[in-house]
Amino acid sequence: PVVVMQNSGFGVSLNAIGSLQDIYAMPCLLVITWRGYEGKDAPEHLVMGEAMPAILDAMHIPWRALGTDAAAADADAQWARARLDEKAGPVALIVKPGVLA
């Protein structure tokens, strides 16, 4: 499966994602928008924007920021596919502001 959400939704979903990962070892691509990236957003997004990479690391979820051009984005998608093939659990592609605009 693929789950697309804002990083605020990721924060709300942490327990469910962690539980599914530990119990079912289900591969899942997480596509997460990076609200609050580099402190450039509404104040309510800044805490999660700063904390998200460390949270992903603490949960042992491999992640990459999606590239800004087609070749880089394709390489990132291939990287994610390879991680999903080798890892029983979630993998994240983080979308910085403006990348998909």
Q: Which residues does each predicted region cover?
A:
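Glycine/aspartate-rich loop-and-adjacent alpha/beta segment that forms the canonical ThDP
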Residues: G11-N15, E86-A101
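Short, well-ordered, mixed-charge alpha-helical segments that flank or form enzyme active sites
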Residues: V12, Y37-D41, A72-A75, L100-A101
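Conserved thiamine diphosphate
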Residues: E44-W79
